[in-house]
Amino acid sequence: MSYPVGRKMSIDKSTPRNQDPNFKLLLLHPKYLPTWLGMGFIYLCKFLPYKVIIFLGTLLGYLLHGVSPHRKQIAKANMQLCFPDKSEEEIDDLVKGHFKNMGIGVFEIAIAWWSSKRTIENLKLSSKNVNIFKELDEDQGVLILIKHSTHVELDIRLMAQEIELGGMYKPQSNEVMNYLMIKARNRYVTGAINNHQAKEAIKWINNGQKFLYAADQDYGEKNSLFISFFGVDAATVTFPERLSKSGVKIVMANVSRNKERFDLEFHEISDFKEEGSVLKEVNEFYEKFILHSPENFLWTHRRFKSRPLGEESIYSEWKSRDKRRSKKRQSRE
């Protein structure tokens, strides 16, 4: 895909509008009953003290750790690559901590999606370098890069409390989850679009919008460069670098959780000219953010799925599944 950057778009200067999801009868299909019941329970958790949410999430995390052997293998393989100096026992402890925080993140959705503005304001939040946006021209677009954390939904809500921003989301395969996610995010995110609308994102950024994007996952080799990530070559999407070369400011954002406290920080990426230099700094910031709280990064994603020519797959146990998916895609084309 080529991105039309490098020039101002002649588009409407008004703030982009969110598209409210339509409630369809399909959402009432019996197959979605477990989803409605589960999310209904999580909704009720918004009335609970945060300590209780952490307790319930911890229990769920331990359950997920016990019933998710494949995801556990992926997390362990990623951590072994990124932390070669850690012993197997230390890696296992990190994996357990990661699943614990994933469970907490599920219950934190109640706060992120359905809590009032006052509840969010009452959370213990420390912000650093928020003034970075006031120093920019009013019409200057900003791409804000975040990481996929176990509490990413709450991260987005906390950032939206500080600055007005748009963002990109990946449509969920579960129709009910997709409906609830978009409906909730539309309350606090301006201009939410899906990951198949990259051109719309560029228009909004070139129009002076602040836009959230996560560049810490493997999106395939087509629009990526192999850049070091914890000393391992990782397919890193070139979207931020393309925008940087067009004059768009790139800002790294991170939210870290320490018990019941949240720390939010922003850092501006330098303007580089050499190919890959922006992506190198982006990954270095991601490494720094992850090291601050390693158990909260989304290790269950196959970050090193794409490999340089000649390298063996790191996730050998997923080879057969990938082949099946590839055949299905080819049959649909």
Task: Locate each region found by the language model.
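Membrane-anchoring hydrophobic helices of lipid-metabolizing enzymes
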Residues: Y3-I146, Y179-K183, K327-E333
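Non-catalytic C-terminal accessory region of glycerolipid acyltransferases
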Residues: P4-I11, D92-K96, K134-E138, Q161, ...
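Residue-level preference for nonpolar/small residues embedded in alpha-helices
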Residues: L37, R71, H151, M177, ...
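Alpha-helical structural context
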Residues: F47, C82, E162, R187-Y188, ...
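Flexible, glycine- and charge-enriched loops at secondary-structure boundaries
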Residues: E88, G191, E275-G276
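General small-molecule cofactor/ligand-binding pocket signal
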Residues: S126, G191-I193, H267
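Catalytic core of membrane glycerolipid acyltransferases/transacylases, capturing the structured
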Residues: E138-H196, E221-S228
